[in-house]
């Protein structure tokens, strides 16, 4: 069935105008953007197949080549889909610029979409103002976190350059288990001592993974 074969009152465009965007399913919203299917393939069915196969969250991370594996999704449509999610990511970043950190949840929300490859462990440092606003973040290491990879001098040199009042460490666990390892605790201890010496406080160390987080401060480990 083609879009034009659907009762006019039930077509996505008409329902959007009549009842608002909330009345449409994710597949219908995507179909509105992609607009047309290919020979023998209804664009709504194509979008339903795409979302049911990958899930909406996973869809945002698919490459152009992976998107094209779904029948009816060529290069142009794959680029449109990738562009949608890239805009969404940039909007999220823009809304979180100068975010005031009140707790670990704020750090978790800020880091969403900012870890380029979640199959690898990344360590970031967030530089904060006197009002606990995030000035900037920087990637410190990529790979398994060990004390030998961490150079406090470089981290705090960057903090001084940014005129940061305090810093927060953030790293991900690709396994999804956010409990800290002994190495995580060792790194935190080293950087806390360096921060105390330089009077640039290490406010927290937040581990993220599998839509969850662990805060050293919340667990009285700082």
Curated annotation (Swiss-Prot):
**Biological processes, Gene Ontology terms:** proteolysis
Q: Which residues bind Zn(2+)?
A: 171, 173, 184
- Name a GO molecular-function annotation: metallopeptidase activity
Keyword annotations for this protein, in alphabetical order, are:
Hydrolase, Metal-binding, Metalloprotease, Protease, Zinc
Domain MPN: start-end pairs: 100-222
Cross-referenced SUPFAM superfamilies, in alphabetical order? Answer: JAB1/MPN domain, RuvA domain 2-like
Q: Is this entry keyworded Hydrolase?
A: yes
List the ranges annotated as motif JAMM motif: 171-184
Q: Which InterPro entries match?
A: MPN (IPR037518), RadC_JAB (IPR025657), RuvA_2-like (IPR010994), UPF0758 (IPR001405), UPF0758_CS (IPR020891), UPF0758_N (IPR046778)
Into which family does the record put it?
Belongs to the UPF0758 family.
What protein name applies here?
Answer: UPF0758 protein CT0611
Native organism is Chlorobaculum tepidum (strain ATCC 49652 / DSM 12025 / NBRC 103806 / TLS)
């Amino acid at each position: 069935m083609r879009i034009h074969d659907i009762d006019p009152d039930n077509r996505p465009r008409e329902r959007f105008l009549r009842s608002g965007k909330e009345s449409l399913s994710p597949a219908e919203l995507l179909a509105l953007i992609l607009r047309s299917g290919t020979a023998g393939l209804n664009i709504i069915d194509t979008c339903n197949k795409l979302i049911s196969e990958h899930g909406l969250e996973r869809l945002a991370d698919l490459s152009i080549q992976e998107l094209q594996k779904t029948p009816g999704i060529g290069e142009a449509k794959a680029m449109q889909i990738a562009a949608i999610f890239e805009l969404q990511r940039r909007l999220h970043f823009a809304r979180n610029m100068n975010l005031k950190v009140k707790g670990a949840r704020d750090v978790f929300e800020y880091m969403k979409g900012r870890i380029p490859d979640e199959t690898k462990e990344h360590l970031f440092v967030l530089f904060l103002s006197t009002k606990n606003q995030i000035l900037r973040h920087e990637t410190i290491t990529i790979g398994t976190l060990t004390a030998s990879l961490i150079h406090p001098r470089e981290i705090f040199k960057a903090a001084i350059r940014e005129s940061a009042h305090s810093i927060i460490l953030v790293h991900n666990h690709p396994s999804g288990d956010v409990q800290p390892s002994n190495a995580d605790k060792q790194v935190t201890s080293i950087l806390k001592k360096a921060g105390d010496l330089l009077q640039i406080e290490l406010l927290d160390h937040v581990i993220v993974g599998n839509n969850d987080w662990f805060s050293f401060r919340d667990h009285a480990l700082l």
